[in-house]
Amino acid sequence: MAKEKFERNKPHVNVGTIGHVDHGKTTLTAAITKYCATQGRAQFMAYDQIDKAPEERERGITIATAHVEYSTDKRHYAHVDCPGHADYVKNMITGAAQMDGAILVVSAADGPMPQTREHILLARQVGVPYMVVFLNKVDMVDDKELLDLVELEVRELLSEYEFPGNEIPIVKGSALKALEGDKSELGEPAIQQLLDAVDSYIPTPKRATDKPFLMPVEDVFSISGRGTVATGRVERGIIKVGEEVEVVGLKPTAKTVVTGVEMFRKLLDEGQAGDNIGALLRGLKREEVERGQVLAKPGSITPHTKFKAEVYVLTKEEGGRHTPFFNGYRPQFYFRTTDVTGSVQLPAGVEMVMPGDNIGMEVELITPIAMEKELRFAIREGGRTVGAGVVAEVIQ
């Protein structure tokens, strides 16, 4: 089958399978592609193709991830599946594969297991906003009461991590049966039911251009007779000439007006998400703006020094530390375009953190950075990346 051209006419949504090892994430992923392929809406990816996902490097971290795509009547989906538990942890923390929603796979024969819990917690911490559950291997459970019990357990676990456990759709089926082309209710119809649930329950994400304007400052220079220009790539939103922006981070927040937007040496009326622009700033001196600050829609983002984070610590094979670190560890935290020193407070009862661990921690920076929940950062020592993290909660 020829690769169909990417249809721009359907909304695009990023999803992924999460859950405990051997509960059937990869089998389900294969079954979805097979089912959609019968309708000409995907290319079938066999279990082995997905399981042998090539390793990718994201910010120096090795992550094995399989990417598949498929369409429903309503949408086009990009779907990620990871072979190993560590790959999931790294993926979710680095945001290498941003998920608008997740499909949590739970084996009905085993019920929720430790990684089920850990993946739900990670999803909560890193800001995966929505979840749909596929209760797999239902054909292996004869007792209806046992099945109801597992469903209840899953709902309670989701509620425990502040997901709406009572509302979340739970679809029962057998990924293996579906993959074998079984037409009984646990086979292909269960896949259709799951796709319907994902279509209706996971909302289409806001496009980057609809969000409030933000541009990390990469460089600053002055143009004689015109003023100060800050350059960078617009992360989100739109900036129009004549609009007011705030310069946030590192120094007290300053207000200014963008009097010109330049791209490829041409003057524009506006710059939008994805554009590399130069923004001409009224009334600011060259030394009042610096790399590491952001230009943002007034009131949309504030500077902070203290936050809770979810962090993955690189192994020495990934170029990370060879030794553990302890409470009070003081590395650099690289946010967007700059390094800021900060000190680490480990959770009560945690003595040290080993390379390869993932851990929740509190961080206090020595200078404030424009910050919000879900912001990604790297942990560095002398320019070398030793960890990756995401802001789980802003404290002050």
UniProtKB/Swiss-Prot annotation:
It catalyses: GTP + H2O = GDP + phosphate + H(+). Its EC number is 3.6.5.3. Residues 60-64 are annotated as: G2. Residues 174-176 are annotated as: G5. GTP binds at residues 19-26, 81-85, 136-139. Residues 81-84 are annotated as: G3. It is an enzyme of class 3 (hydrolase). The keyword Protein biosynthesis applies. Residues 136-139 are annotated as: G4. GO terms for molecular function: GTP binding; GTPase activity; translation elongation factor activity. Mg(2+) binds at residue 26. Keywords: Cytoplasm, Elongation factor, GTP-binding, Hydrolase, Magnesium, Metal-binding, Nucleotide-binding, Protein biosynthesis. It is found in: Cytoplasm. This is Elongation factor Tu. It comes from Anaeromyxobacter sp. (strain Fw109-5). The gene is tuf1.
